[in-house]
């Protein structure tokens, strides 16, 4: 199974870090984005984004992930299901072309890759502490004020684009930019693009989203 980032972290941690970064609303390969212009009213966007995320207590969706490798013309496509529930509970389950499970419950992480299982505490890893904070900020609507990123916001008729350029060393060593597309109807994330320093990029699209769905706590149990 291909691992997303070829850098300084052990393989399981590489995948977990990318997954958690999806909740940071979890952004840019170009200086400008075709079809987008700089947001007209930044204060209004931040206020409405914060209000919408505060009302969102859970998210359930399908996802499609595309991994584009700079050394290969072929892209790697994966599919699965995603769940989020306040406070700080995430379950991401890959079903195609391989089975992979990640559960994040506050400061505890559980990973199952085939028959291999691994448990990790975010308290023991500074990068993970930073990522965990980003996730919480996003769910609370305060991610746009995170000093660990330089932020720019663009918009078109139907969506907003948030470009995050990492400033903190841990994130700078992993990513050049992270781009999040937000639906203007409900301010939910429709896609995330992560551009690595190597030139590789990962795009994750969220489909069939259900906001404030009834999700049992048992889905996030870390034994």
Language-model segments: what does each one mean?
Residues 8, 16-25:
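Sec-dependent N-terminal signal peptides
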Residues 81-129:
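An acidic-aromatic
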Residues 120, 144-223:
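Gly/Pro-enriched, hydrophobic low-complexity segments
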Residues 74-81, 104, 200:
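Amphipathic hydrophobic-ligand
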Residues 63, 90-94, 109-112, 162-164, ...:
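Short hydrophobic/aromatic-rich beta-strand segments that constitute the beta-sheet cores
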Residues 30-64, 68-73, 218-223:
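N-terminal leader/targeting segments and the immediate start of mature chains
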Residues 53, 130-143:
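Short, solvent-exposed helix-to-loop capping segments enriched in aromatics
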Residues 2-3, 11-16:
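Positively charged n-region of N-terminal signal peptides that target proteins for export
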């Amino acid at each position: 199974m291909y691992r997303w980032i070829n850098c300084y972290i052990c393989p399981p941690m590489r995948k977990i870090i990318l997954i958690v970064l999806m909740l940071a609303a979890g952004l840019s390969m170009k200086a400008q984005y075709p079809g987008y212009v700089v947001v007209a009213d930044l204060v209004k966007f931040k206020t409405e984004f914060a209000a919408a995320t505060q009302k969102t207590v859970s998210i359930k969706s399908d996802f499609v992930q595309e991994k584009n490798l700079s050394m290969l013309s072929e892209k790697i496509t994966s599919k699965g299901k995603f769940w989020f529930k306040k406070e700080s509970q995430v379950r991401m389950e890959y079903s195609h072309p391989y089975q992979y499970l990640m559960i994040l419950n506050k400061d505890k992480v559980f990973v199952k890759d085939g028959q291999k299982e691994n448990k990790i505490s975010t308290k023991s890893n500074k990068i993970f502490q930073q990522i965990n904070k980003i996730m919480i900020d996003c769910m609370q609507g305060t991610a746009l004020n995170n000093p660990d990123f330089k932020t720019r916001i663009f918009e078109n008729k139907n969506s907003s684009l948030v470009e995050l350029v990492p400033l903190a060393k841990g994130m700078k060593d992993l990513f050049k930019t992270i781009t999040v597309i937000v639906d203007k109807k409900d301010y939910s994330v429709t896609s995330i693009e992560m551009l690595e320093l190597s030139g590789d990029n990962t795009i994750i699209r969220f489909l069939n989203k259900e906001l404030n769905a009834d999700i049992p706590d048992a889905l996030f149990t870390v034994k």
